[in-house]
Amino acid sequence: MLLMLAQWLQDDFGFFRVFNYITFRAVMATVTALLIGLAAGPWVIRKLAALKVGQAVRTDGPQTHLVKSGTPTMGGVLILIGIFISCILWADLSNRFIWIVMIVTFGFGLVGWVDDYRKVVYKDPKGMASRGKFFWQTLIGLFAAIYLAFSVSEVNNLKVLQLFYKWLRSGFALDLPAKTNLLLPFMKEVSYPLGIMGFIILSYLVIVGSSNAVNLTDGLDGLVIMPVILVGAALGAFAYVMGNAIYAKYLLFPYIPGAGELMIFCGAMGGAGLAFLWYNTHPAQVFMGDVGALALGGALGTIAVIVRQEIVLFVMGGIFVAETISVMLQVFWFKVTKKHFGEGRRIFRMAPLHHHFELGGWKETQVVVRFWIITILLVLIGLSSLKLR
């Protein structure tokens, strides 16, 4: 919104030309979201506490968590408010990628809100029925995946519709441009053609998988938000490079017109995340809830698909991956051993993985900071693929 105003005024007031720089608007989006979060935080926390949306704590988990019972949850609303207001102010609202990421973020956030609401208001520990949650996640994920299959290689929505029409006329046999290929990190100009169905399936898995992986990681004070900020910032760097024809050519990446604007969203997500961390750091005054975790994970997955960095997301989000795998292995092994031995056995003391380390003697803050350190290292590895090719 401010960009349109600045472009209208820049002929008379030259200093407004600074708004044309994505880097400037990304910084301002970060600061704006941070200030909104810090200012609105106390009010949001008071409202959540007044509504008695307190977090229920598992009695079979670490006993140190019992004191957290009743702490307001659904604090992810604070993050989403900061992101959306900041993006509306600083992003180019004619950019199709900004809108698809915001739609996915809002959609997953809405699913998470319903899940949280049922848990804390209706006192239903299961929350939203798993089938219902999966249905809505699938609907949102497929919508984004199908749109991006025809959007990543084009410059505007008219071209997107034309490509989609060509695909229909070809009897679903049209090949996508090379820009939609799966990029292999650390490999110079090596990519794997996915085809339209392959692109849609992979994109769906990345978007929905990332959403659920971030949600599983959200279990300790401050644990998930810092990795989200770090991975989001790195994806913002990839978006800036691949949205710039000169940098993309120099670094041997496909040029994706409009992708650079996602740096604004990543900046807003980082600023809103830091503001949330201010209130979520141990001992937490508020928890993120599914409304925040599902939304942020979906946003990361969608951005990774747009900038063709699905594998790099897998690397940089290694903590999310490890947490998810720990849950899958625990459930699988429990069911297998129960079937064969009559009682379920466990691989980990408790899943997700962060609880395993807690029950092993690590303090909560030790788990959190060490997971942050691991994420920093993984993000540096991911960023190195910008040049090491």
From Swiss-Prot:
Its EC number is 2.7.8.13. InterPro entries: Glycosyl_transferase_4, PNAcMuramoyl-5peptid_Trfase, PNAcMuramoyl-5peptid_Trfase_CS. Pathway: Cell wall biogenesis; peptidoglycan biosynthesis. The chain crosses the membrane at residues 25-45, 73-93, 97-117, 134-154, 190-210, 222-242, 258-278, 286-306, 311-331, 366-386. Keywords: Cell cycle, Cell division, Cell inner membrane, Cell membrane, Cell shape, Cell wall biogenesis/degradation, Magnesium, Membrane, Metal-binding, Peptidoglycan synthesis, Transferase, Transmembrane, Transmembrane helix. One of its GO terms (cellular component) is plasma membrane. It is an enzyme of class 2 (transferase). Its cofactor is Mg(2+). Its main location: membrane. It is found in: Cell inner membrane. It is a multi-pass membrane protein. It catalyses: UDP-N-acetyl-alpha-D-muramoyl-L-alanyl-gamma-D-glutamyl-meso-2,6-diaminopimeloyl-D-alanyl-D-alanine + di-trans,octa-cis-undecaprenyl phosphate = di-trans,octa-cis-undecaprenyl diphospho-N-acetyl-alpha-D-muramoyl-L-alanyl-D-glutamyl-meso-2,6-diaminopimeloyl-D-alanyl-D-alanine + UMP. One of its GO terms (biological process) is cell wall organization. The keyword Nucleotide-binding does not apply. Catalyzes the initial step of the lipid cycle reactions in the biosynthesis of the cell wall peptidoglycan: transfers peptidoglycan precursor phospho-MurNAc-pentapeptide from UDP-MurNAc-pentapeptide onto the lipid carrier undecaprenyl phosphate, yielding undecaprenyl-pyrophosphoryl-MurNAc-pentapeptide, known as lipid I. PANTHER family: PHOSPHO-N-ACETYLMURAMOYL-PENTAPEPTIDE-TRANSFERASE (PTHR22926), PHOSPHO-N-ACETYLMURAMOYL-PENTAPEPTIDE-TRANSFERASE HOMOLOG (PTHR22926:SF5). NCBIfam families: mraY. This is Phospho-N-acetylmuramoyl-pentapeptide-transferase. It comes from Polynucleobacter necessarius subsp. necessarius (strain STIR1). The lineage of its organism: Bacteria, Pseudomonadati, Pseudomonadota, Betaproteobacteria, Burkholderiales.
